[in-house]
């Protein structure tokens, strides 16, 4: 059940950049977006930014929510954090399959693969797109705050992150644990053609 996680920024340093000129032009020429947010989306953004461990606000910087166990020592905390965002924002209630209580969590709550499978199989989420970067980058512009991205390597989801904003060209930005990130590009710098992205609406 452990989800040993390699920082994708480091993983991409020695890999060829797959962003072609066509892709670069598409990204550069895309318009800024100003989505109308629901109360749940506003709460998801606020929670993610406060407890990501890399917050810009000095008061909240480098802090996780102490109400929850930090699962980094057990293989990774990314799915735990994504689950927290969904629960604390009021998006979903806990149940027998997706649950955290007194330092213990179900696989669907704390494991990246289990989390993705549960959200899809339960009907709580649906696919926007999945595939390599060149296959999904256009569809990524359909991501909204509170949606999440799963990162598949060698057939398994090894990481998840939550959409919490956009850059000046409308490129979705994510926030996550492992390694702690605040408002970074949704592709996380992964340029390995073996990586598949799962873009999921919740």
Language-model segments: residues:
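Active-site scaffold segments
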Residues: 76-84, 160-164, 174-175
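Short beta-strand edge/turn micro-motifs at domain boundaries
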Residues: 1-26, 172
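Short, solvent-exposed loop/turn and secondary-structure capping segments
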Residues: 94-98, 160-162, 186
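Active-site-proximal beta-strand/loop segments in catalytic clefts of secreted hydrolases
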Residues: 98, 151-154, 176-179
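N-terminal capping segments
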Residues: 22-109
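Low-complexity, Gly/Ser/Thr/Pro-rich intrinsically disordered linker/tail segments
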Residues: 171-181, 186-202
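Acidic/His-rich structured neighborhood in mature extracellular/periplasmic domains
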Residues: 7-18, 96-117
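...with weaker cross-activation on analogous glycine-rich loops/strands in unrelated enzymes
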Residues: 103-173
């Amino acid at each position: 059940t452990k989800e040993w996680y390699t920082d994708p920024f480091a993983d991409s340093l020695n890999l060829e950049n797959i962003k072609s000129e066509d892709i670069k032009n598409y990204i550069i020429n895309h318009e800024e977006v100003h989505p109308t947010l629901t109360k749940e989306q506003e709460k998801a953004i606020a929670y993610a930014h406060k407890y990501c461990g890399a917050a810009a606000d000095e008061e909240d910087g480098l802090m996780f929510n102490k109400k929850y166990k930090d699962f980094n020592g057990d293989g990774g905390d990314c799915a735990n954090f994504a689950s927290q965002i969904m629960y604390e924002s009021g998006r979903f209630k806990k149940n027998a399959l997706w649950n955290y209580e007194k330092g213990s969590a179900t696989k669907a709550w704390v494991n990246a693969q289990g989390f993705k499978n549960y959200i899809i199989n339960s009907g709580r989420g649906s696919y926007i797109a999945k595939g390599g970067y060149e296959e999904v980058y256009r569809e990524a512009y359909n991501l909204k705050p509170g949606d999440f991205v799963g990162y598949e390597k060698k057939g398994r989801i090894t990481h998840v992150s939550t959409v919490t904003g956009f850059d000046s060209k409308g490129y979705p930005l994510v926030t996550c644990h492992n390694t702690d990130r605040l408002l970074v590009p949704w592709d996380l710098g992964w340029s390995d053609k073996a990586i598949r992205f799962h873009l999921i609406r919740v």
